[in-house]
Regions:
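C-terminal cap of thioredoxin/glutaredoxin-like
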Residues: 136-227
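N-terminal Sec/ER secretory leader and immediately downstream segment
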Residues: 44, 51-54, 59-61, 208, ...
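Bacterial N-terminal signal peptides that target proteins for export
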Residues: 1-8
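Sec/Tat signal peptide C-region and signal peptidase I cleavage site
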Residues: 18-23
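A short beta-strand-turn-helix
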Residues: 30-48
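Extracellular/periplasmic catalytic domains that process cell-envelope and extracellular macromolecules
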Residues: 43-45, 73-74, 91, 169-174
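Bacterial N-terminal signal peptides
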Residues: 8-17
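Structural alpha/beta surface segment adjacent to cysteine/selenocysteine redox centers
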Residues: 51, 56, 62-138
Length: 227
């Protein structure tokens, strides 16, 4: 009669042990409230990746952005960007559509530069008209003609919305939600449980690489918005 409680206790302790180690490469486990974590995986051919859900008008996203880019380049891991425009930032959905236009119609490299420049120029953009003026000037400076209608079919907006819906499935509640992922594990850097320090990305990334059986041996794809 006394063995059953002992067995049950052992099962509970084992479960707690699993919870304590899941989703951490360094430090103690943080409760993240994520739901569908199936998207927290590196792309084919990579063992480790950086995943970020970001809003172009988010000040902390602007702070995290150069750290993410530098870490991805230094450690040869993919940087997977998902657009998560917040409702209170009335221009950022359109900004994400502009970035998608550049990615599809011009070049992914120029789209990456546009995102970087928007982040660094947030103080100049308060509304959709400001974004329009910024984008027109930016395109002229980069030898591009701004189209009269950026997204006539609505396909680019649909892809931004698809990113946002993925964030809802994951239960993204803040930006940036920044996560280091491997094939069977992940750790949140920013976006959950008051984690707001993007400088923790590098130590977490290094720990994740160390824990994989084969770290990436050559440069991965350049940072890109998720298709």
């Amino acid at each position: 009669m006394r063995r059953m409680p002992l067995i049950a206790a052992a099962v509970v302790l084992a479960g707690l042990s699993t919870l304590a180690t899941h989703a951490q490469f360094i430090g103690q486990r943080v409760h993240d409230d994520f739901k569908d974590t199936s998207i927290l995986r590196p792309p084919a051919g990579s063992e480790v990746a950086i995943v970020v859900f970001e809003d172009l008008g988010c000040p902390l996203c602007a702070r995290a952005h150069p750290i993410e880019v530098q870490a991805a380049q230094q450690y040869y891991v993919p940087l997977l960007r998902y657009d998560f425009p917040l409702a209170q930032h009335i221009w950022t959905f359109n900004g994400a559509v502009c970035a998608r236009y550049l990615q599809d119609k011009v070049s992914p490299k120029l789209a990456d530069q546009f995102r970087s420049d928007v982040f660094s120029s947030q103080r100049l953009i308060d509304n959709k008209d400001d974004l329009q003026q910024f984008t027109r000037r930016w395109m002229q400076q980069h030898g591009q003609q701004m189209p009269f209608v950026m997204d006539p079919s609505g396909s680019l907006a649909a892809r931004v919305k698809a990113d946002y819906d993925l964030g809802l499935r994951l239960n993204v509640t803040a930006t940036p939600t920044l996560v280091v992922v491997t094939r069977n594990n992940y750790q949140v850097v920013c976006g959950k449980n008051n984690l707001v320090d993007p400088t923790q990305l590098v130590p977490i990334l290094r720990a994740a690489i160390a824990q994989t059986t084969a770290a990436p041996a050559k440069p991965a794809a350049k940072p890109r918005a998720k298709q």
